[in-house]
Structure formats: structure tokens, C-alpha cells
Regions:
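Membrane-helix entry/capping segments
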Residues: 1, 8, 12, 16, ...
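C-terminal membrane-exit region of the final transmembrane helix in multipass inner-membrane proteins
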Residues: 2-3, 385-415
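Intracellular coupling helices
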Residues: 4-11, 15, 308-349, 406-415
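Short, strongly hydrophobic transmembrane alpha-helices
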Residues: 13-40
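A hydrophobic alpha-helix feature that marks transmembrane segments and, especially
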Residues: 35, 298-325, 395-396, 400
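Structured, solvent-exposed hinge/loop segments at the ends of secondary-structure elements
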Residues: 35-172, 192-196
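"Rare, low-scoring activations can occur
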Residues: 78-79, 83-84, 163-164, 170, ...
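Transmembrane alpha-helical interface segments in multi-pass membrane proteins
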Residues: 302, 323-369, 384, 388, ...
Length: 415
């Protein structure tokens, strides 16, 4: 049968095709947005951290009772932790993966003019403590560090006119420079009027940012290490690298060292949080896993309802046209012809529904952006959702189409 005759048949019996197309359109709109939201939840979970996660104990929520801790207090704390049996290294830090209490965000601009939002980590010896892999350049030299005081108190000034040394990730280097060659180059902060720039002295393979909500669309490694050691501070965090696997005895000794060094000057009603990186990661992604389960239920429900709906409507349509199918068989149509006819017919109906569904997906995404701060739906999810609906439509119509192909020519003589 020609395409013109097929379209003519659809126009004469338009109710069933319209119902199928509307069902496909609604399912396509839902699936396109759900697939996008699944990717948003999965992206930070699948992003490589770049650190020795199975060897890290993270300590935060440390606040002083009265006056801020001095740089000397922080140095004594680091030394006390390094002397704990089983501890390989320890660094006081401002900003760590899976630690959201201390957050530094900034914008960097490189050779290609692009402004890239990044998270900054500060602390002496973080490359070694976190177990980062340098792929180019070097670690900071001891004489390059300057004290960083919270609120600007105790900040050591940088050399006049000299750019600060920084270590960035390989992904960030590729965003800031078209050729990815950032080593030795100077970056700028467009939002800082007194900025003298940042000279890249090293590049690490990966380092996960601590703003997990932004760790999507290739931005999970938008992280920079600054040559600053923790000075005067009223909010203290430590990264402690221990011999694997992390034992309860080592964790207890680390907690005792913190209590011994900072207990007398620490707020009694604020208990420091001491846990492994794996525990922090599990807690940080708890809401992501719950969302993924919800999206899985929605996806399965939409798929099942769509398939059942198409099968039911198409089956009813086949039943109504049994005599017409029998006439075609009597006129010489083979089973393969009947099967192909229904598959093509379904592809046309589902295809038109998918086109409408892509438009509905965009409109639905606009509503979600307005009311729930969802990101803009990338265009690639539109054809993906449409393709899924076309495949589902073909699978759903296969059963009724096979039954139609099995109709004998004698059915044309039945009333």
C-alpha cells in the first residue's frame, strides 16, 4: 500500500490515531525531562573524585569557644594528628570534597576569554594529603604558602604585583585554554579589582568540587588549589590520610588527638564531625539516590502505561478492521505486507506524537525552570525521548500487528 493510501485511511479513521499520538506525546514529554533529571542526579555520583577516598578521614564543624584559633594553634593541631599511629599525613583546610560547611567560589578567566566558575580549596600539603595525581607541573613549594585568615584577619600579603601560584585540574585547563596547555600561564579573576592573577604551577588529573549541585555538565572538576595555609580562623577543618583500610581504632585515636589539642578551647555545644570520606559521600548522595528511585518508578510507570495503551488501542483497531484485512488477504496481500502496514502506520502515528511530545517537553522544562530551579533542558534529550517512544511504539504494536497478519482471507466473507 502506498503512503498516500495509508494517510487516507488514517484521516478516515482519525480517533484511534489521535489517541495514540496524544499518549505518545505525553509520554515523550515526561521521559525527556525525566532522563535529563536522572542525568543531573547521576553526574556528581559518577564523577571521579581524584582523591584517595578509602584513606581519608575528614574533620569539620570545629569552632572556638571565644577567640579564633591562631596560625600556631592550627600548626600544633596538624602536628598532633601526624603523630597519631596509622596517620600518614594531615592538613588543615578551607574547603574539601564532601565538606560543604566551608565554601569558596570564584571565577577564573584564561587564554580563550571564557569565564569559568570554580571552587577553591586552601591548605598546606593538600596534594599529598588528598592523594592527588599530578599530570603536569609540580606541587607548591614551602616558601610559596601564605597564611589565610578567615574574614581577612591575619592574611599574609602576596608579593606586590606577583601572580599567586595555583594548581588546577586537567578539565579546568581545557576549559580555560583551547589547547589545554595551562601550565605556566596566568589566570585572572574578573571580579577582583586588586587581582594580580594566578600562575598555574601544577595540573592534577581530577579533584571533585564541593558544590555538588554544580558538579554537572562537565563541571565536576572545576576546582583550584591555592597556595594558602590556614591561619587565624573560627571555623576549622582537617583532612587526615591514614593507612588503609580505615579502622575504628585509628578513627578513635584521631578523635582523641583533636579533643586533646582543641578540647579546652572548643565550643562544648558544637561537636566536631569526624567521619571517613566514604561515609561523607554516602550521606551527600542520599537524596540523589532517593531521587533516582523516584525517577525509576516514574519511568517504568510511563513506559508500561504507554505500551499497554498502544497495544490496547491498536488491538481494538485491528479487531474493528478484521474484515478489511481479510479482503486485502483475499486480494493477494501476504502476511508480511499486513505486518509491514501496521508497523509503518504506527511509526507515522507515534512519530507525529513524538514531534508534539518534544514541544511539550520544552514547555514542561520551562515550567520546571520557573518553579523548581531546574536547569535548561539540553536539546539532545528531545530526539532521545522521541526515539525511545518510536521504539516503544514499534514493540507495543508488534503483537496486534502479528494477529492482524494472521487473519485468514476467509474473514472477508464474515459479517
Amino acid at each position: 500500500m502506498s503512503l498516500r493510501m495509508l494517510l487516507s485511511t488514517l484521516r478516515r479513521h482519525s480517533l484511534m490515531p489521535i489517541l495514540v499520538a496524544l499518549q505518545v506525546a505525553l509520554a515523550c514529554a515526561i521521559l525527556s525531562n525525566v532522563l535529563f533529571m536522572v542525568q543531573q542526579q547521576l553526574a556528581p555520583m559518577l564523577a571521579p573524585s581524584g582523591i584517595a577516598g578509602d584513606e581519608l578521614i575528614l574533620i569539620d564543624q570545629m569552632t572556638p569557644r571565644q577567640h579564633p584559633w591562631s596560625a600556631a594553634d592550627v600548626r600544633r593541631g596538624e602536628q598532633a594528628l601526624r603523630q597519631v599511629p596509622g596517620v600518614r599525613d594531615a592538613s588543615a583546610a578551607f574547603g574539601l570534597p564532601m565538606v560543604s560547611g566551608a565554601l569558596m567560589d570564584m571565577a577564573l578567566q584564561g587564554g580563550n576569554g571564557a569565564k569559568v566558575g570554580v571552587n577553591g580549596y586552601l591548605g598546606a600539603g593538600l596534594v599529598k594529603t588528598l592523594g592527588l595525581q599530578l599530570v603536569a607541573g609540580r606541587d607548591f613549594l614551602p616558601e610559596e604558602y601564605r597564611d589565610f585568615g578567615m574574614g581577612g584577619v591575619g592574611n599574609a600579603p602576596w608579593d606586590a604585583g606577583a601572580p599567586q601560584p595555583v594548581i588546577i585540574t586537567r578539565a579546568l585547563a581545557e576549559q580555560l585554554f583551547d589547547d589545554g596547555q595551562a601550565l605556566g600561564k596566568v589566570l585572572t579573576d574578573p571580579g577582583d579589582a586588586d587581582d594580580h592573577g594566578y600562575r598555574v604551577v601544577g595540573i592534577v588529573r581530577h579533584l571533585l568540587r564541593n558544590q555538588l549541585s554544580l558538579a554537572i555538565d562537565g563541571r565536576s572538576d572545576n576546582t583550584v588549589l591555592l597556595a594558602r595555609r590556614i591561619g587565624s580562623t573560627s571555623l576549622l577543618s582537617f583532612a587526615v590520610r591514614v593507612d588503609p583500610p580505615i579502622s575504628e581504632a585509628t578513627r578513635t585515636r584521631v578523635a582523641e588527638a583533636i579533643k586533646r589539642e582543641f578540647g579546652p578551647t572548643m565550643k562544648a555545644d558544637v561537636i566536631p564531625r569526624i567521619s571517613s570520606y566514604a561515609e561523607r559521600r554516602a550521606n551527600a548522595f542520599k537524596s540523589h539516590r532517593a531521587a533516582l528511585w523516584l525517577f525509576a518508578v516514574v519511568t517504568v510507570t510511563v513506559v508500561v502505561v504507554t505500551v499497554i495503551g498502544i497495544m490496547g488501542l491498536t488491538g481494538f483497531w485491528v479487531q474493528k478492521r478484521t474484515r478489511q484485512i481479510g479482503i486485502r488477504r483475499a486480494l493477494g496481500a501476504r502476511r508480511a505486507h499486513i505486518l509491514r502496514y501496521f508497523l509503518i502506520e504506527n511509526a507515522l502515528v507515534a512519530g507525529s506524537g513524538a514531534v508534539l511530545g518534544m514541544l511539550l517537553a520544552v514547555l514542561g522544562n520551562r515550567l520546571l525552570m520557573r518553579h523548581y530551579e531546574l536547569a535548561h533542558l539540553p536539546w539532545r534529550y528531545l530526539p532521545l525521548g522521541a526515539l525511545l517512544m518510536l521504539v516503544l511504539g514499534q514493540l507495543a504494536v508488534l503483537g496486534p500487528a502479528l494477529r492482524a497478519a494472521a487473519v485468514p482471507p476467509v474473514a472477508a466473507t464474515r459479517s
